[in-house]
């Protein structure tokens, strides 16, 4: 990087860090986004903080440029945050699995635990190409902790299970976490133990969502809260996930699993699906009165960028959401509970 580019980036990093000062706990144990280059002026770079571990993500750069950029970021941020104990570089555009999952540039091993809203979450920062703990769903974890008391919860596409753990921490009566990967679900089990939660209240199952949903429907199993937070795109022998083209189909697979009066939580992170398109698709599903959009859960400003730090906008307008990660809580009624024009229940 030439001097002008280095000077520009250090200025952007300094400004971003200034606006996140209130999020920097002592001792450091939380998880925050320190810099979102997509929105804050340097698209090849995202910097996250997990307790004392700095995770540097590079995008669309070769190995040499990624390393040079990460070393510059390391030097700049360690001068301001001298308690950082580890720097991990993840090269998202690399063809080498180890480089994508992360190489330690500084310090010892990455942290294995973060705290959020009074809950501990296990980390496995090198398990996958992302960090394994999604910062954009922080608000949803808070909602679950606040609203899941005495509720049964199904967390589909659970990944490392943080949403289900948040529900248990909020007093859920039972949580079922399903994901195709048993390795990812092991992280959920580790989080359960960190919080000394009742292990009998959480069931994990390494199974395809479409298989599990079919089995549950046949058994007439229902849950008070069902969460669908799928990957952007996935194709398995039993089904397809496409967050741009098939949101309605996925919702219709999940809604029979929700109890009458329960909640369906839908997360869509399709970058090129506008907020208006997504909310329009959901509103079309509410026309018969069986579904009601209750809440839109915003993404934290450390992820979206602050008014004073944002330079670039998403490629499509996210409104009425504040980020391409679009989170909606939908109330579900069963057909027998919908009143007819004579104010009688349908039988």
Cite the ranges covered by each PLM segment.
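Conserved SAM-binding motif I beta-strand of class I
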Residues: 174-179
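Non-catalytic substrate-recognition/targeting regions of SAM-dependent transferases
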Residues: 41, 48, 69-134, 142
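C-terminal catalytic and target-recognition region of SAM-dependent MTase-like enzymes
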Residues: 263-347
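Conserved SAM-binding loop of SAM-dependent methyltransferases across substrates and taxa
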Residues: 160-173
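Non-catalytic accessory regions of SAM-dependent methyltransferases
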Residues: 1-51
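S-adenosylmethionine
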Residues: 209-288, 292-295, 320
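S-adenosyl-L-methionine
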Residues: 181-227
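Conserved class I S-adenosyl-L-methionine
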Residues: 150-159
């Amino acid at each position: 990087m030439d001097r002008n580019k280095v000077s520009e980036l250090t200025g952007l990093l300094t400004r971003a860090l200034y606006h996140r000062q209130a999020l920097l706990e002592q001792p450091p144990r939380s998880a925050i986004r320190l810099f979102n280059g997509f929105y804050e002026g340097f698209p090849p770079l995202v910097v996250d903080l997990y307790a004392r571990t700095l995770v540097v993500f590079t995008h669309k750069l070769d190995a040499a440029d990624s390393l040079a950029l990460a070393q510059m970021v390391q030097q700049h941020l360690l001068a301001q945050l001298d308690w950082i104990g580890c720097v991990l570089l993840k090269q998202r555009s690399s063809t080498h699995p180890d480089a994508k999952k992360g190489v330690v540039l500084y310090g010892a091993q990455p942290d294995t635990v973060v705290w959020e809203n009074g809950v501990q979450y296990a980390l496995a920062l090198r398990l996958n190409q992302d960090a394994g703990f999604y910062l954009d769903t922080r608000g949803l974890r808070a909602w679950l902790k606040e609203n899941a008391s005495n509720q049964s919860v199904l967390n589909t596409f659970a990944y490392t299970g943080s949403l289900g753990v948040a529900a248990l921490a909020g007093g859920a009566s039972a949580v079922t976490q399903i994901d195709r990967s048993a390795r990812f679900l092991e992280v959920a089990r580790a989080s359960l133990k960190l919080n000394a939660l009742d292990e009998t209240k959480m069931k994990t199952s390494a199974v395809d969502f479409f298989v599990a949903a079919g089995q549950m429907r046949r058994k007439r199993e229902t849950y008070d809260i069902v969460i669908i937070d799928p990957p952007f795109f996935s194709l398995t022998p039993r089904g397809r996930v496409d967050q741009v083209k098939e949101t309605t189909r996925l919702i219709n697979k999940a809604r029979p699993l929700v109890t009458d009066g329960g909640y369906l939580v839908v997360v869509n992170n399709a970058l090129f699906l506008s907020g208006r398109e997504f909310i329009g698709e959901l509103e079309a599903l509410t026309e018969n009165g069986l579904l009601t959009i209750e809440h839109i859960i915003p993404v934290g400003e450390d992820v979206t960028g602050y008014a004073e730090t944002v330079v670039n906008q998403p490629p499509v307008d996210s409104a009425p959401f504040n980020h391409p990660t679009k989170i909606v809580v939908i109330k579900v009624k069963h057909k027998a509970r919908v009143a007819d024009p004579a104010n009688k229940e349908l039988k």
